[in-house]
Amino acid sequence: MAGLYLHIPFCRRKCPYCDFYSEGVCDTTIQGYPDLLKQHLAWASKHGWSGSFDTVYFGGGTPSLLSPKAIADILHTIKQRFGLIHNAEITLEANPGTVTQENLVGYRNSGINRLSLGIQTCNDKHLANLGRLHDRQEGLDAFDLARVAGFDNISLDLMFALPGQTEEELESDLNDYLELDPEHLSCYGLTAELETPLYQQVTSGEMSLPDADFYADAFIGVHDKLSQNGYDHYEIASYAKKGRTCRHNLGYWQRRAYLGIGAGAHSFCAKEWGERREVPSDLAAYRDAVCSGQDPTQHLEGFDRESALSETVYLGLRTRRGVSDSELQQRFGCTLQEAFPEAVAASAPWLTCNNGRWTLTPAGWLLFDRLILPFL
């Protein structure tokens, strides 16, 4: 089975911290975009991609700028061209500032069964600093509207280590989220990515992010609070109630095949050692390629045995499932210890092995970027 990702690269206003590809809103462009996606799906079905999908993910950008009818038409094309398994997970990312009761009901009726709401924080001051369209009450209302619309699988984004954030403010956010009682939480520390307005603000001294000690305390504090309240910390930034992990993202971390549709989307073909392809982040070029029946993708990254092994370890150690020696032996002919003896030794305080399965502790996840380097 494979996953399907569809990129909807439109935003009413781009957040200053975001480095994902997006375009400004133009009604004509948005209205024509679903047809491009359907043409791209048709092309992919004739050029190497076949079989049913078990997960579909509408990401962005702001997918909730598309109408429920547009989403329904795209899902109909997916079923026609490929098929969806029974109980496929179908996720739509939504901005609380763009949803209404009517369109949430429409999304649910179209086949969307998992909603990812980008609330980020319930603090009005921090929402303003992050450049979000919504305020605290609109975020809370969007969640309630989603419940009324029939969504019983909702994920919320939580950002921490925000400029000027206090421990008390983060604790208040966590309490607000727990009161909402979502099935899933994606919790990210704010980082200043290159070529974003936030990066320019930080490097110029206009804005400062919390120091490493605050970040570490916040990461562990989020882990402790959510773990004590019934959430499984199953990946560095992901928490879920029992049976509510994000199946689509698990496919990424397990190096399963996925097809990317839309400007800026990536695909991964799992044949042999694997190949990653991308659609350039250029809407005009994407439109030209799709409308002329050409391949809109280009080669991004190829893998040999060594690079595939390193990526398998990199992705696996991000998760609580970890890395299995038996699976490495079957796929690569070695155990983790045999392949990376020095890296394993250097990670010993944070890397544990139980019955041939290697996992990082929560403290190890906090140090992930440093600990993983010797494995790459």
Task: Describe these PLM feature segments.
Residues 1-8:
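Immediate flanking context of iron-sulfur cluster ligation sites
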Residues 1, 22-46, 51-334:
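C-terminal scaffold of the Radical SAM
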Residues 333-346:
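Short amphipathic alpha-helical interaction segments
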Residues 363-376:
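Short, amphipathic alpha-helical interaction segments positioned at domain boundaries
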Residues 348-356:
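A short, conserved structural fragment
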Residues 357-361:
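Minor-groove-contacting beta-hairpin "wing" of winged helix-turn-helix DNA-binding domains
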